[in-house]
UniProtKB/Swiss-Prot annotation:
Residues 368-389, 435-527, 543-623 are annotated as: Disordered. GO terms for biological process: maturation of 5.8S rRNA from tricistronic rRNA transcript (SSU-rRNA, 5.8S rRNA, LSU-rRNA); maturation of LSU-rRNA from tricistronic rRNA transcript (SSU-rRNA, 5.8S rRNA, LSU-rRNA); rRNA methylation. The keyword Nucleus applies. It comes from Emericella nidulans (strain FGSC A4 / ATCC 38163 / CBS 112.46 / NRRL 194 / M139) (Aspergillus nidulans). S-adenosyl-L-methionine binds at residues 56, 58, 76, 92, 117. Residues 461-484, 578-601 have a biased composition (Basic and acidic residues). Its EC number is 2.1.1.-. This is AdoMet-dependent rRNA methyltransferase spb1.
Amino acid sequence: MAIQKKHGKGRLDKWYRLAKEKGYRARAAFKLVQLNKKYGFLEKSKVLLDLCAAPGSWCQVAAECMPAQSLIVGVDLAPIKPIPRVITFQQDITTEKCRATIRSHLKHWKADTVLHDGAPNVGTAWVQDAFSQAELVLESLKLATEFLVEGGTFVTKVFRSKDYNPLLWVFKQLFMSVEATKPPSSRNVSAEIFVVCRGYKAPKRIDPKFLDSKHVFAELADPTPNNEAKVFNPEKKKRKREGYEEGDWTQFKEIPVTEFINTTDPIAILGSCNKLSFQQQPGGDLALATLDRLPETTDEIRNCCEDLKVLGKKEFRNLLRWRLKVREKFGLVVKKGQAKDDEAEEVAEIAPMDDELAIQEELLRLKEKESARSKKERRKENERKRKEIVRMQMHMTTPMDIGMEQLGPGGEDATFSLKRAEKAGAAAAMASGKELAVIESESEESESETEYDDSDDEGDRLERELDSLYEQYQERKEDKDSKLRAKKARKDYEADEWEGFSDSDKEGSDDEEDEAKPNVPVVPTNGALSNNAALFFDQDIFQGLDDVEDEEDEAEGTNNMTVANEREEQQEEEEEEQPKSEAAPEKKKKVKETANSKPSEDSSDDEYEDTDEPRKKNGQLDIDIITAEAMALAQQMATGEKKSQDVFDDGFNRYAFRDVDGLPEWFLDDENKHSKPNRPITKAAAAAIQEKWRAINARPIKKVMEAKGRKKFKAAQRIEKLRKKSALLADDETMSERDKAQAIARMMSRAAKKKPKQNVKLVVAKGGNRGISGRPKGVKGKYKIVDARMKKDVRAQKRLAKKKQK
């Protein structure tokens, strides 16, 4: 019977065959190849240390990928066959002798990369094998901390087990970046993963506990249960799935009530037990029977003892009070009066407090008081801002100048006054009930102070993280897309362009100064008013505002007059330079009217921005239709299907007045991309735009236009030179007319553009062309008949030429 070879858990896969083809000693070589392809640490390394290197496949990969003249050292318990450019020796990495040997090979160098692909001899219990491998990883890390350079890389194999997380924690303390990965060449059934640690911190001193397996893999003691929280805050319960206690299989604890009375820690019993039993034991219990007959032991107490897990804070307090009463009756607790009488003889002497200590305590108390006050003010300010944001989001804002006209200059006619409240009888109501409400609200605010501050800080932190992640995403996107980088560069260039100062800047600063002034509503007195408005503004309260208004109008009028005069002079200069048109006198007239008219308070920079828009010579805006939507709208307005009022009405939609203040950048980008009106377009408009872009794209680019221009310029230069030479030949009396004509013809032929060389057409001698004599049918110009024999002759000629060269 033939012997069938076992495949050993699928180890003879494609990586095994590839390792045989490439000449690697083990399939594990491809694990390092894939790790290096992902992280790229071998190309940057000059010195490498490979721990547990047998049979040497990782050293082979390192010798191929690392630069020339690199130092590679491999060590293992098993012997390693020699590898070119690699130093190998046989030692145990846990011994001091191995450290000395490595130090002798490295000399004064530090390793840029330390590799570890070792594993113990497995085959016993899995828990023991995983722990042995974790210990081996810790030993390799100890060697790495001794020989690794600052910023170096450490790559190790780890088994997935309960010791994996402690190892990962140790790695993160010593390296800047720690990533766990599983290369494709690693078998899926294998529990191994590879941890790549980059950026070694190289601390000056390392705590020995970091590299001690007894300390790193020690099992943590169970935390003491918080029974006080279970008793005093039973409503706030968080399930913690931590398993069961040893030996507690039923999860139900029942103890007699006498144990609860006699214990010194009743809260622990209430937090851990399920029931307090009044049931008598078989032998009988006199104390338990007495407890059951006491008048303090009511039916409510008995019901509470039946199930402690469903009780609330109030019921637990009742049980504790009942316990104290019972202990006093049984004489287990001494009353406070008796305790004072017994301890009256012993009087404690309190030493007077030192002056310096008293000053320190007073300063500490004042500092705490000041911090509490600032925290309270900050909380109120945050609450006010939050309410203001909510009001703005819900469009609940109201004009703040409504009712301001009733205020006098000193505020004597304010809306609220204490005298009016006393007359109306509201002062007593405020003193009785409102003050209590305020105090209660302040106490509630003080309780929720910490939670609100924490939630506010957490929200700000999350927003900052989202913004930073979005910026990283944008940078990665720009790195991949060259068009996006060019677009951003154009935006930055346009933003950096400086065109000097303009009058609008000065006007903007004047507006800011005006905004800084208090908002005192000024009622216009000039102009046409309705009857109701005239009656309203005839009140006594508006009589003192005329002088103030006139002074402000005069000041603003002088400024606006100077601006208008400057614009008028500029317009006149432009009209002198440009040809006169019909629109010029109208513009000049408008400028004069604005200069002579009284300036209004509502004038802003928007009126001056219109003059900066690009315009044609005839005064019309220089607007080009480049989208299908614009073309469709232009066609509709040209045919009369839509009017300007319809276009104005279409501008009022749900996309027009979106509130974008305070929104993050990533949200605004997404909204601008997707949340926009979808305007219908016609087939004719789309075709017109396509035709327009087709005509634009048909035009040659700038480089082609420049090349054609250069060719035309050179041709013109040649013709001019030829004309001058022809004139010289015509004036030469020594030459005959025939010679002159021939010389001019030769110069013309040389100056003329040469015809492109006609390619020789190859005709294969097979089929109808086999053995043909003369020109084949359908072939014009130069031709050459070729066959397979000719190919062989050409190859033979090339071989002979090479031999002669040698």
